[in-house]
Amino acid sequence: MVNLVVVSHSALLAQGVAELAQQMTQGGCQLAVAAGVDDLDHPIGTDAIKVMEAIESVYTPSGVLVLMDLGSALLSAETALELLDPDMAQHVQLCAAPLVEGTLAAVVAAS
């Protein structure tokens, strides 16, 4: 089964998308969140290490689909792919779909 990673600049946004997706599919696939940065004064942003760890947490040879909200989230996801073991990275796809709609469509298709 393909699993998903939601990458967002906002932890609250990503958690909300993940919660909605999991409610719609009742846990049909695993979904991880990589969102926000560890800065209490400026929590908005993305972190390539968080993205890499999220991918590793739901990895399956069947694949991992990564959905992102804004431009620099794509850069973080691309960096995360470079940090992954190449054997693992070949099973990871980055998806340019709108974050909410794309995540919902992907979890329904994967479930």
Regions inferred by a protein language model and the residue ranges of each:
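N-terminal loops that bind phosphate or other acidic moieties
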Residues: M1-S111
